């Protein structure tokens, strides 16, 4: 609890407040903003026809039961409502009540008589446009109402009491026959449309020209067969039990699925396309298998002098002895001049090797 709230109030509290308020200087803000808030002497307040007095109530409401009314004739002094006076522009107030022009009764009676004498077309010229709008609206409303009534009457005539008599057996059969014909026609049309649709669906599109098909699949992996080992009983003893006999059956344990591998196939529609993409080169020349003329075996060597193939050393000696006998009887061949002095051999032809100049010696 604060000290100020607990102590007793002073008797002289607020004595100097009135003096401070009188000595306070007026602020310029309230004198200049919006034209100032001070009242002018020449500004008359607006006074309406009705006095700004509070509602009069019965005197019994404000008087307690124990109090006696001081005087019934005294009336409360009306209090005027003060408003803030500014120098801003104000629109002139218009009187709510129209002014009554004091006209003599004779003139008004004469005007009424003149108006009655005028034709209807010339009366109320100022309100002609308004009356024309009213008349067009009323005419349009009347036409709309007539149309609605006509529609309702037509609907009533249509929905009137219409009693359909039951059809006879002959009429029912005739109607069923007509319905059957219509159903058959509809069924034929439907079947024809379905057949056309199936033809269009199953019609395969053919691509002109060569076709290369790429197809990749998975196939079971097949291992290459290796050398098969056989157990040979050398000493005549019983063979040792195989590993398959010692191990239990594979059916008791889990069986692993066989391994698989991928294979890719490329198919060509014709051989011409295949040869175009994979041209084949010239096949290699297969060497001619030469035979030794002495032993009639495949020749493994060739004599450089006689250019005769031979298979063994004995065949080589026989070939040389025959060559010596030939030289003794016929002399050296043309190619043998290269071994001794003599005229130079002729120039070889283009494309021919040294073997082309050698003379073939046939041993019979």
Swiss-Prot record:
Question: What GO biological process term is on the record, naming one?
Answer: regulation of DNA-templated transcription
Keywords from the UniProt entry: Chromatin regulator, DNA-binding, Isopeptide bond, Nucleus, Phosphoprotein, Transcription, Transcription regulation, Ubl conjugation
Keyword Ubl conjugation belongs to the record: yes
Which residues fall in a compositionally biased region of kind Basic and acidic residues? 127-142
In residue numbers, the region (Disordered) covers 1-165, 335-357
Instruction: Point out the DNA-binding stretch(es).
Output: 156-206
| Presence of keyword DNA-binding | yes
Q: Which cysteines are joined by disulfide bonds?
A: none
What Pfam families does this protein's entry cite? YL1, YL1_C
Q: Where in the cell is it found?
A: Nucleus
**Chief location category:** nucleus
The record's listing under SMART domains reads: YL1_C
**Family under the similarity heading:** Belongs to the VPS72/YL1 family.
The record's function comment reads: Deposition-and-exchange histone chaperone specific for H2AZ1, specifically chaperones H2AZ1 and deposits it into nucleosomes. As component of the SRCAP complex, mediates the ATP-dependent exchange of histone H2AZ1/H2B dimers for nucleosomal H2A/H2B, leading to transcriptional regulation of selected genes by chromatin remodeling.
State the protein's name: Vacuolar protein sorting-associated protein 72 homolog
Q: Which organism is it from?
A: Homo sapiens (Human)
Native organism taxonomy? Eukaryota, Metazoa, Chordata, Craniata, Vertebrata
This chain is encoded by the gene named: VPS72
